[in-house]
Amino acid sequence: MALTEFGKAVRKARIDTDCTLLTMSKELGVTSAFLSGLETGSKKIPKKWVKDIQDFFKSRGLELYDLQQLADVSNEYVSLDGLSQSQQMLVAGFAKSPLTPEQLKRIAELMKNINSNGD
């Protein structure tokens, strides 16, 4: 089965930290089949596991910043819990927008700049 973007990020992180799937699964207390399922998308990715995986790699000196977003895409689900009405409307608007991929890319870059600058 092909890897999801989440799976690609996790696999790259394992390679970058010289960690095998088996080593990671043992340290996290799960089977390698479970982790493989998260990488391939055959299993939904619980928020708890995103945090656990981020912490796992952080302890090895590697920060994974977009992992929750990649998990949301892999799960085909974005929670609106805790978002304001205007944020929820914005998410819904983007989900059904007629914007081109180039326009969406430009908006994503703008949002990234806003978030990184704290403006």
Language-model segments: which ranges?
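Residues within the helices of the helix-turn-helix
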Residues: 11, 22, 51
